[in-house]
A protein has these predicted regions:
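Glycine-enriched alpha-helix->loop->beta-strand junction motifs that scaffold or abut catalytic
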Residues: 44-50, 72-76, 94-99, 105, ...
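Short acidic catalytic loops
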Residues: 49-54, 141
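Short beta-strand/loop segments at the ligand-binding rim of alpha/beta enzyme cores
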Residues: 18-28, 68-84, 99, 132-144
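Short secondary-structure boundary segments
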Residues: 54, 104, 167
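Gly-rich Lys/Arg/Thr-decorated short loops/hinges at beta-loop-alpha junctions or inter-strand turns
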Residues: 16-26, 42-49, 73, 106-114
Length: 253
């Protein structure tokens, strides 16, 4: 233990750490042929959990991926999704998932519902998924649909154990993205994983487009059906200030 460790513990008493004092880290993987290779590399690097991250989690490819990981790494924490039904939660849990992500098309920059015709309003999805999660005694994560602190309150009240937040944190200094000046105000760029830019680069596998191996930018953009958009959010300063506002809203709720 060093002085730096003591200062970190004092400044961040609620930091999520493992038994060696390191910040816990999870990593997302797809369901491609290189799944085992990627998970093996992550486990060697000390990952705490892997997330099988797809737009439609209640599918044979995801179920088989969970079974493969659980067979090879029985003690590794597995998060899987996304689903919006009780049946989806049951299927993923029975395959070996420890936690299930809930939400299809709920994100502020996600257009899956209008592009694919699939999805459910987020509060309804959490309420539906929680029926199975409570019976199976597994946590669910509300992924998307959080624009204000009140949305976190509603998600937890509906049955979510926790939530994933994108747009509320996207404008913080600590988040990735370029700072832009637009009409005299500071913004940060923000794009969905299903946007054309992200899918052309690396995330096409998540949406089952099968175009992740296409080489040229023009070929990629011509063969992909985007399920998200790119935009900008106001720069909000330090993430500590943003979280303080969230906590205030949660306490009031």
């Amino acid at each position: 233990i060093t002085v730096k460790d003591i200062l970190k513990a004092t400044e961040h008493p609620n930091a999520t750490q493992d038994d060696r004092g390191r910040l816990r880290c999870g990593a997302a993987v797809g369901v491609g042929a290189d799944l085992e290779e990627r998970v093996n590399a992550l486990v060697k690097a000390g990952v705490d959990a892997v997330c099988i991250d797809t737009a439609h989690g209640h599918s044979l490819g995801v179920l088989n991926a969970i079974r493969r990981i659980r067979s090879d790494w029985p003690d590794l924490a597995i998060v899987a999704g996304n689903v919006v039904t009780a049946e989806g939660v049951e299927a993923l849990a029975e395959a070996g998932a420890d936690t299930v992500k809930v939400g299809v098309g709920a994100g502020s920059i996600c257009t899956t519902r209008v592009v694919s015709g699939a999805g459910l309003p987020q509060l309804s999805a959490i309420w539906e998924a929680a029926r199975a999660a409570d019976r199976l005694n597994i946590p669910i994560i509300g992924d998307g649909g959080v624009a204000y602190s009140g949305d976190i309150v509603k998600a937890i009240a509906a049955g979510a154990s926790t939530v994933m937040i994108g747009s509320m944190l996207a404008g913080a200094d600590e988040s990735p993205g370029e700072v832009e000046l637009f009409e005299g105000r500071r913004y940060k760029s923000y794009r969905g994983m299903g946007s054309l830019g992200a899918m052309s680069g690396y995330s096409a596998d998540r949406y089952g487009s099968g175009q992740s191996t296409v080489e040229s930018q023009s070929e990629r953009s011509g063969k992909i059906a985007p399920e998200g958009i790119e935009g900008r959010v106001p720069a909000t300063g330090s993430v500590l200030d943003v979280i303080a506002q969230m906590l205030g809203g949660l306490r009031s709720g």
